[in-house]
Amino acid sequence: MSVKQALVLVNMGGPASTEEIAPYMRAIFADPFILPLPWLLRGFVSNKIVKKRTQPVIEKYNLIGGKSPLLKWTEKQVKLMRRNDSPLFEHITHAYRYTSPTLDQTFASLKKGGYQSVTILPMFPHSSRAMTGSIEHEAKRLAKRHSITTYTIDAWGLHKEIIALQSEYLKSAMDEAGTGARVLFVAHGIPMREVKRGDNYPDK
């Protein structure tokens, strides 16, 4: 009997409306991988941040339609991947770390569907404790609860096929832009305390 396998694309998530911004921020700062403080102190600091930042964040979201575009693009990626019949995965879906559908909801649904193996694909090409570490930790916790085997594809941006494809698109864009075009590489930073704790994100 073959094992039913599913692939889950996992992203941070985002608010689908301005009403969801405060709960979204609260969920982020409740994560010890994001805000590594003792539980009570983390809750206190989280509430302070959310109270102070919600309105300014709402104003910025209103400039882009009042919701996160990440939701639309993640769903589009899943639909495109489903077009190609996978010889390995019977089902391809998505989950978010901080908004619905959450990893918890997705694992429960997969368990109900009889899936015994779940491969997690974080939608970040790098590895970082705060992002991919949080996702992998939560996935392992839920896999244990539902008796599902789980795997995580980590730091996939280092694969030579991905780099070659990115180079191809970049060269095409540079050729189209013409002489004088410049490429700006932008990356998230992480607190130095995380680097000292062994997070190798800067090396990526």
Give the location of each predicted region:
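Active-site-proximal alpha-helix that buttresses catalytic centers in soluble enzyme cores
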Residues: 2-204
